[in-house]
Amino acid sequence: MDPIRSRTPSPARELLPGPQPDRVQPTADRGGAPPAGGPLDGLPARRTMSRTRLPSPPAPSPAFSAGSFSDLLRQFDPSLLDTSLLDSMPAVGTPHTAAAPAECDEVQSGLRAADDPPPTVRVAVTAARPPRAKPAPRRRAAQPSDASPAAQVDLRTLGYSQQQQEKIKPKVGSTVAQHHEALVGHGFTHAHIVALSRHPAALGTVAVKYQDMIAALPEATHEDIVGVGKQWSGARALEALLTVAGELRGPPLQLDTGQLVKIAKRGGVTAVEAVHASRNALTGAPLNLTPAQVVAIASNNGGKQALETVQRLLPVLCQAHGLTPAQVVAIASHDGGKQALETMQRLLPVLCQAHGLPPDQVVAIASNIGGKQALETVQRLLPVLCQAHGLTPDQVVAIASHGGGKQALETVQRLLPVLCQAHGLTPDQVVAIASHDGGKQALETVQRLLPVLCQAHGLTPDQVVAIASNGGGKQALETVQRLLPVLCQAHGLTPDQVVAIASNGGKQALETVQRLLPVLCQAHGLTPDQVVAIASHDGGKQALETVQRLLPVLCQTHGLTPAQVVAIASHDGGKQALETVQQLLPVLCQAHGLTPDQVVAIASNIGGKQALATVQRLLPVLCQAHGLTPDQVVAIASNGGGKQALETVQRLLPVLCQAHGLTPDQVVAIASNGGGKQALETVQRLLPVLCQAHGLTQVQVVAIASNIGGKQALETVQRLLPVLCQAHGLTPAQVVAIASHDGGKQALETVQRLLPVLCQAHGLTPDQVVAIASNGGGKQALETVQRLLPVLCQAHGLTQEQVVAIASNNGGKQALETVQRLLPVLCQAHGLTPDQVVAIASNGGGKQALETVQRLLPVLCQAHGLTPAQVVAIASNIGGKQALETVQRLLPVLCQDHGLTLAQVVAIASNIGGKQALETVQRLLPVLCQAHGLTQDQVVAIASNIGGKQALETVQRLLPVLCQDHGLTPDQVVAIASNIGGKQALETVQRLLPVLCQDHGLTLDQVVAIASNGGKQALETVQRLLPVLCQDHGLTPDQVVAIASNSGGKQALETVQRLLPVLCQDHGLTPNQVVAIASNGGKQALESIVAQLSRPDPALAALTNDHLVALACLGGRPAMDAVKKGLPHAPELIRRVNRRIGERTSHRVADYAQVVRVLEFFQCHSHPAYAFDEAMTQFGMSRNGLVQLFRRVGVTELEARGGTLPPASQRWDRILQASGMKRAKPSPTSAQTPDQASLHAFADSLERDLDAPSPMHEGDQTGASSRKRSRSDRAVTGPSAQHSFEVRVPEQRDALHLPLSWRVKRPRTRIGGGLPDPGTPIAADLAASSTVMWEQDAAPFAGAADDFPAFNEEELAWLMELLPQSGSVGGTI
């Protein structure tokens, strides 16, 4: 903190000769040290003044006797002093000059807003100096020039500006002139010298001893030396460093220059000397402090006293009171640490025993400036605030746990009734405002300005509270009152944008936006939205100024885009991150092989500066010694707290892998989130407990830990798993599903609280509650469902299932609230149906999509010719808002300039990442058609999938390689690329095609078939399991290819390896039957067969094995589940068939085995186009007979002739529709929400770094893509709750970067809190999506399904023969 000094010396100061001020003046960053033999000997060290008012002296007196002075000081508690007061106090008789403290001090002073100091304090403290009037004439005589105006030096002749000269005290001018030449010769600037002139003694010390300082502190910068020297007694602190720096650099502390400067700057000369004198005692037993802890304690006002108190009280507080050494250090590491520790010793038992606070909360209160006073105030006011005002102890602790906690508590006691009754705030809002540094002033300012800001400026009370609920809230509110009209009228910002800036960057950011917005927009090409994004963070002012300075350099010299510069700057610490990127980008790219995009990804987080520096230091170690890839290192670093996560991975990776059996990929997955450090440490501690005592698997523990807040989620699972399972009937897998998201802790606690209410009072099932909770923001979604479910159902006509569908996404809360608000408008004014509104809302970012539909639907329909159904189709995806806006912008260009049809544009836009796909089509369509020979339709086909952007870019890059080097045709490349995960599939084909063909004997067509259906994961699994399945299990390569050539091929192959012996040896199936089931119904069908054969369900008990196999091949698990649950209209159909069909032919049962053989033949055929003709020969069937067989199993003649069989679930839907047991499936854009269970694995992390591919996900991380021959394992009636929570980690998470929440089959999306800009799927997203059984993959067969004719009576009879003869179908035929 900058010291407060009167520019007019008091009589006491004038007495001091020559250099005495350096030794005598009280220092603001340490206790004052009077000269030996002075009249203050023996008195407590004087600290800076407090905001606590002191009584006025009885009468003004020009001087006190020594005795009366001592008496006065005894009444004055040094611990009450608060340096924040002094920062804002103007000097007596002179204009106030703003100080320029160091960054940390500036932040502290900015956050500690203090009351204006009472005059009586100044009188008492100033007058209370020892009487030294007699020596004054000697000083005046010795320095007559000081008082003579004629003697003042005109420093402008030395290059000082008028403003700089005004900052230099008149009496210091001659000293500045005397040392100017020497200081400039040492490299100090005029600004440096002006800052040093605050403490004139430092001018001479630095001028004379600079070379010695650099020798002792070789890394010290000019700013470091000025930062120490400008403090009171700064010259003595610099001289102390010269004396002891060498020894402090050595054992036991081994401090670096930065630490030494920090101690000298903040703790002063006494702290430097105390650290030197006590270094062995502090680091040795029993204290055993680390060097960092010693620096933390010493680097504060009163650091010397705090060190001495730690030596004395640390053993007592730890042994007698149960604190940890880290907690003691935390308390001591603030101004007033000594007093806080002593008060902690005295009040900890009282606050814990009498008031029920846990020790952690007491430590939190004490660990701030003014901790002593805060503890005493909590003891006094806790009962009053809780009993009389209804606050909870946690709220009282939250208010007290900040600088100025005492004053904030007292102000809450005084103003809570007023703010609630007169201004309509809630107690929670009052607590939120008070729970920051400067809470007192913020509360008082809210009381004063709330009416003005709401009535005159149109803000809401919530917005006023948001602005006030930060450090510096008072100043921010006052600045909003002053600048809101200017920023809105003159600069075009909205009130919401002004509120966003004020609620984060505060006063300084608002003023800087006013000043720099025109410059950044006009001269640098930024948009107002980008300027607002940069400003809306702590340090927004500095970030804006740095963008103005470095944007041209970073773009022109380093090749970054303005958007990347904005991304780096739009975080807390943006200034430092930008400067570090400028410094380290060349090093990280040239020496370490990172790409600029990866460097930007690392820098674009809180703590980006530190993360970049740590990557530079640890990348070689983590890659060479620990076997990580650069991509993995980047993934870990590209989160808030990346520095700490990297250091923890370096430390714990060997332990977690060797002692706990984790893989490096799992360690990386845990570390690659905000809070990765804490999550890794918690996994090390709790993994054995959760696995042994609670029965979780290692994979489940990793799933929980691999999210933001993983530490808290693990601890909550340990605590609540028994309760939720025993008392509430959840399964461990459901508990894991809830916990495996950002905010898992809060979601689990809310489920515990609301599950009984939602089930009993609102009629939800536990599965539905779990589905809602199993997303980011699950807590808020559950609470909103409790509040809005009755309203949405009764007033708006939605069903319970629709409300659950909307809520079961990240941002569910906001989506529900928006549906409540916009449903009437969209239906009445825009003609949408409630089902369409639900479809739009039932995705991540549903709120934004609904609002955009309301805004753009008329424009898109009237001006661009879209139908409402097409608008709904585009909006009904993650990123729907951005896709709609991009369609509005690019539709004319794509149609007029590039010749696309409106339907093609809609097809491209109607996927996750539609915005980016459209933009990429605009950019690459000419290149791909002209340079690579693709047709326009082929480009559209590639783009019309999730990840279309990345697939198009990969086709541009790899098409020549795959065709020229590997012999693929362009059509084959397009076929592989035209699926979700196309990018990764193409890259895997390039890598594995030679291996699979040369080493495993597959043909090129077979590799293409696997890649075009099962994708990257299926190709890798075939490489791994083909020898095992052929040699150990007797399958042929064609059969392995048939199983792999489906969505989920990886999981199907692994399940065949696991279950083939069981099904053949224990249950009597043949290998061919197992292959038929696996190649039609996949993993889920195989597991359903095993479950039925092991534990027969009554509904299927009457079926023979051949019947079961046929049913599984016919419709997979959905068919078996549907039969178990009872098929609608089946009894009526059976009666009708019984009446109309006479004697049944005896060959029908044989037909089922034949169906299985035919389906297996087609699935295993290496050339599907020839399968139909060869099947006629193979099975001795006529063309018509084979077509009829396929009709019975839901395949059209066109599909059969082409060998392209639809997924089993699609065939089953056709069968049910053709038989009349199920209504035609409504259009997803007009009737109901697309099945949520069908996308349960994909879009969990699309909200991160959405508009640019994230370098952290460029590794091998894709899943089996959802493909043209894909399957869905959903039940035919929609997503069953049971399916929504099946944990599938072992099959799906085979790559390190898959978002852990994808292991749970659940509704899609993860836009927590309603992201403003979800959009681009990055490589990992596309990779993981490939493990999903997405029903939309059946889109190529949709038209055929709609036209599939109804069964005739013979075909109905055949179907009824396949179904059970009794039970769920209710009769026989």
Swiss-Prot record:
The lineage of its organism: Bacteria, Pseudomonadati, Pseudomonadota, Gammaproteobacteria, Lysobacterales. Core repeat repeats lie at residues 289-322, 323-356, 357-390, 391-424, 425-458, 459-492, 493-525, 526-559, 560-593, 594-627, 628-661, 662-695, 696-729, 730-763, 764-797, 798-831, 832-865, 866-899, 900-933, 934-967, 968-1001, 1002-1034, 1035-1068. Its main location: secreted. Gene3D superfamilies: 6.10.140.500. Residues 1136-1364 are annotated as: Acidic activation domain. This is TAL effector protein PthXo1. Residues 1-68, 127-152, 1250-1286 are annotated as: Disordered. It comes from Xanthomonas oryzae pv. oryzae (strain PXO99A). GO terms for molecular function: DNA binding. A motif (Nuclear localization signal NLS1) lies at residues 1222-1225. Pfam families: TAL_effector (PF03377).
